[in-house]
């Protein structure tokens, strides 16, 4: 196949059609039965502790910034895809966690490929995902004038020059890893000549590639990025927003840091392939004297198996007709996933299971698919549909019966937090009221493969003379059957037996007389190998480009020919179309209802087909969102890899997330032998822990360790479980293995609730947890007894504020002189002096009054 308090539509029909087209973030709450289930508060923290949050907390404590500002900067040359989910949610959640600001920026610096349709679709898809940037929506093109002014400033400072050699010569002059770069004849042009040439470049006097503007840094630098990188290039193409006003466009390494500084971004997060580019970022911040200045931080990139996210390759799939468009449900674009029927809650739940580290990692696509299944299990009412029908005549049934069958199985009813379940048309009712009428008639349809004239051993469905139970309707016996000339079964004659009859199997069915005809589109993974553009791909296939920007943006990479070697790994039957029947109860349901067709999978009506002008109300087209179970597990996890004949590199002595070591830009392989595989018992526990809300990493660690598993067995299920699991793995693990932890897991849920509600800080929670582990007292009892979370009176707070200001007169004077960023410094000092007991809002008001 192809989390926080969200206020989202419940999967409204897809409307924005394209033209043929980890830190563990907060664990998304499991949806309760039905789409109108009551919302649950989010678990906390929004972003679990990691190296970036540690930096942010140090910066805030030191008063480096008044508040956190992050940004997500997609390149509008294609549609948002699953590869953007982790990074965008990390940026958004981080800003929210620290009460900061999140910016959405369109990096529209490539006039050849940037389009308004891509801007609109990206913004629409990110809103669907749950991101909210308010008024902070920006285009890089809004600041072309300012970029240009900075370019002239660099020239006047002697820090930039116009280069006039050919692109090939420029590449040669840069040298390589063992040879330093060589100055070109134009490196020492005068300021006047450089300014004249840059202005003429801007005016459009020169052809593409005739000149570029380069930074003058260090041609001998070991970091090749510092060898006089290109800042501006000539592109004589109209821009979708500025038309033909500009003939030069900034390179990514120039635009990115400048735009961060202009927007007031504090912590600029990007993936690991930009680690060397940070040197240019820092050089520009120093040369242009931004204060306070932003800083760039790199995290390990997250890839997804059985998927490609290169926009060039996705575009090639569309152009080659291998998919129907950018919204083809087999594509990894968010637009396609929306059409497929995946909900934003499922995508966020997937992102919640991915951790932030400094190591690249490829995520098993089963993690994503299981998040989709878990979401739909509690969202999709059960009905019956027959996709490949064969007719059955019940010879002893004279009239029609109306059966009342439940929408929900017992496990969904059991897990409902309010004891109610949803109805397809909306609203929540008692489980016994959540039923639909299903007609039982003389003629039925069953699945063709549910009847076998010559059954193999172990076949438990219908056979000649054998019995089977019809779901909710009773037991039938096959008396005889007919075939066509090819030997294919055309009809079955059967008898409806009494309830005292016995049958080994259960099958689904629909009334042949009353069921609705429908088309069923069965989508599967687009690629048949885990790494279609990596270890499985042709050696000449390029797969090194960053997620958002190539090494030299706008230098032709996006328009260069793409190796089609990856296409050899397309799944031949990733789309199968069948025509069958669905029970008539669906006729009155909202078009966006997601169903579980029993024994078949999760489906919904294709929203694009609903929009077609020539569609009729009775022309039902259902697309399969996901199968009920992972049908790829064996072939993808074992057999497939052996067939490819690839040997895995040794990882002896390395940690589970460090196949190439922290900070390496080389990706860790998803199936590299990081540890022994889970035993069947451990795998069952792993699955159970995931279902309870634990992150993938925490669940795997706990499932392997009897001491940890025994401890969390006493934890209460619910929204706090993920935090309890995280504390178990990260705070209590050593003590549990040594048998020294005295606190009960059941006592941790109230502590987690306190953190989630904001009543307790993470620091106080960890301190109380450590004391509880040693004493056995409940953490909240310790907090109350020892006053760890006791607030300050207004008078006491004012006294501390006055003392801090008196101890820092120079900073107080600077603040009053306009350096308002120092408010963060004073906040940190007061928090330190009060051991974190000051209420943040009261503190902010007290500081502003005292510094006025």
Swiss-Prot record:
Annotated segments matching region GatB-like: 636-852
Subcellular location: Cytoplasm
Positions with biased composition (Low complexity): 28-38, 664-675
Enzyme class, UniProt record, top EC level: ligase
GO CC entries: cytosol
Enzyme Commission code: 6.1.1.18
Gene Ontology molecular functions: ATP binding; carbon-nitrogen ligase activity, with glutamine as amido-N-donor; glutamine-tRNA ligase activity; tRNA binding
Motif 'KMSKS' region: chain residues: 308-312
Pfam families the UniProt entry points to: GatB_Yqey, tRNA-synt_1c, tRNA-synt_1c_C, tRNA-synt_1c_C2
Entry keyword annotation includes Aminoacyl-tRNA synthetase: yes
Record carries keyword Chloroplast: no
InterPro entries: Asn/Gln_amidotransferase, Asn/Gln_tRNA_amidoTrase-B-like, GatB_Yqey_C_2, Gln-tRNA-synth, Gln/Glu-tRNA_Ligase, Gln_tRNA_ligase_bac, Glu/Gln-tRNA-synth, Glu/Gln-tRNA-synth_Ib_cat-dom
Spans annotated as Glutaminyl-tRNA synthetase: 1-635
Protein name: Glutamine--tRNA ligase
